[in-house]
């Protein structure tokens, strides 16, 4: 089932490398005790820079957990709103999409992933990401930690193990690994979660053209696969 809101998106949006973060609004005042940092992330599950950004965000959180508590919410974005549900060869798809830039881009991603201790895998299929976003929404109903951990499982599978992001078995198994209950039943009905994904797309992602895109405590907004220190600076600025 196609999302109505996707008709307003260009066929291909942008998966972004890092750029310098800008403070977009005044920081929230300090509160007694540990400050809660709320992070909203717009991403697509086939965007490698979204995974890079997540890993760097995790590093920043680990380095800051003695100062802050964190709540992370993931929201949908569609790099290719017309991608086929049945899946197509990943390498061939990106070779066609990027043309002469493909080889250089893949070399760059391989280098970046190795810097994270991972091997970038271009095998397998790519395609429509709606079911993965439906599942991420469903996971969020069972807790932000489970949702965050699910995003990790999906990214590990798709980017390093050649798993297809639209494969039902892979989605359900990823949900099982992070303790999400009822995933198979939820995904069985193709209408489940579509309305909510549409609403989140409109609320969090309709104004952006590339991902990953972060909003910290509703104040600081930046995009791209940022290094950990960018996140840490944003946490500190918001606390002052």
What are these model-derived regions, one by one?
Residues 55-158:
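Structural alpha/beta surface segment adjacent to cysteine/selenocysteine redox centers
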Residues 13-14, 20, 39-43, 54-66, ...:
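C-terminal cap of thioredoxin/glutaredoxin-like
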Residues 23-37, 200-203:
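A short beta-strand-turn-helix
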Residues 46-49, 98-102, 193, 227:
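Residue-level preference for long, well-ordered alpha-helices that form the structural scaffold
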């Amino acid at each position: 089932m196609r999302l109505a809101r996707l008709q307003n998106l260009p066929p291909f949006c942008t998966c972004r490398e890092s750029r310098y973060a800008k403070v977009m609004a005044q920081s929230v005042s300090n509160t007694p005790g540990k400050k809660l940092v709320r992070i909203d992330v717009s991403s697509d599950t086939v965007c490698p820079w979204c995974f890079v950004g997540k890993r760097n965000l995790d590093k920043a959180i680990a380095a800051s957990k003695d100062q802050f508590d964190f709540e992370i919410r993931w929201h949908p974005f569609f790099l290719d709103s017309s991608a086929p549900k049945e899946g197509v060869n990943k390498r061939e798809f990106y070779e066609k999409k990027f043309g002469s830039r493909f080889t250089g881009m893949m070399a760059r991603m391989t280098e970046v992933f190795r810097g994270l201790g991972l091997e970038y895998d271009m095998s397998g299929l790519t395609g429509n990401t709606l079911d993965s976003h439906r599942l991420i929404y469903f996971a969020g109903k069972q807790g932000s930690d489970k949702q965050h951990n699910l995003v990790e499982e999906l990214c590990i599978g798709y980017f390093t193990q050649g798993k297809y992001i639209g494969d039902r078995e892979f989605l359900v198994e990823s949900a099982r690994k992070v303790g999400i209950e009822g995933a198979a039943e939820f995904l069985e009905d193709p209408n489940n979660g579509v309305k909510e994904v549409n609403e989140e797309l409109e609320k969090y992602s309709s104004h952006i053209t590339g991902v990953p895109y972060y909003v910290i405590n509703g104040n600081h907004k930046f995009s791209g696969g940022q290094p950990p220190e960018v996140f840490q600076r944003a946490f500190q600025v918001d606390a002052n």
